[in-house]
Amino acid sequence: MADTSSRTDVSTDGDTDHRDLGSDRGHMHAAASDSSDRSKDKLDQKTLRRLAQNREAARKSRLRKKAYVQQLENSRLKLTQLEQELQRARQQGVFISSSGDQAHSTGGNGALAFDAEHSRWLEEKNRQMNELRSALNAHAGDTELRIIVDGVMAHYEELFRIKSNAAKNDVFHLLSGMWKTPAERCFLWLGGFRSSELLKLLANQLEPMTERQVMGINSLQQTSQQAEDALSQGMESLQQSLADTLSSGTLGSSSSDNVASYMGQMAMAMGQLGTLEGFIRQADNLRLQTLQQMLRVLTTRQSARALLAIHDYSSRLRALSSLWLARPRE
């Protein structure tokens, strides 16, 4: 009986232990389920935020891509235009005028129109210079000389107006000097003569001058030299900037990214080249202002002699070019 009671007690204790263990397991399962639900809620919220961020990033990416495609299209159009102009220039080439003393670029209608206008301008200038020379040789009075001198200066203003219009159409034609003779091109600076160099050449042609006139011409020469140096430095900076633009990026690759980069470089380079027109205009303004200020320092008769000296110097350069082109060749 004692053994039976003992077994019964053990069995009862075992059942109680199993019930307690089952209850604990139930609580643990419920807790785990609650924790899993909370984790799932947090995960869902993170996923929703991530999806929202992804959608926003995708929207911004589409906008950037649209803007980039538009930029590429604009660059492609500009590049196509450049290629067409280059092809026309190659087809038309370069020809020598019938006089044999001047090479002309035929890179477009703008260049041809300028060459024709400059030729007419030169003919009128020759006529004016002959008139001025005759007046000086005939010892004409200051009033008559002043009328002719003013006409010559107005004619120079017309030249710079013609050049300004030509620069808008083909600035490279002006910079290359193909509208000048070969000898003149040796001394070309930003599409024309250096004012400071002309003043040096005129120093011996205008004697005798008063001390005040000498000081005025020297001061004008220094001022012109400083302005020329500033423009030359600006051109050097432009050339360096252009070289940096064209050399940036990966070379030799034909991937779509590099093609797009190439087109972007060309568009940027075209924008930089647009400043060349400004350099030509500033250089011509300096030339005109130097001539005007020079005439203010000189007397009327000295002004007439100075304009003749400039004309004769240019004429000799053109004559030298003709002789050079006509020289015997072995």
Curated annotation (Swiss-Prot):
Residues 1-45 are annotated as: Disordered. GO terms for cellular component: nucleus. Residues 44-107 form the bZIP domain. One of its GO terms (biological process) is DNA-templated transcription. Residues 111-327 form the DOG1 domain. Residues 72-86 are annotated as: Leucine-zipper. Residues 15-27, 35-45 have a biased composition (Basic and acidic residues). The keyword Ribosomal protein does not apply. It comes from the Eukaryota. Belongs to the bZIP family. This is Transcription factor TGA6.
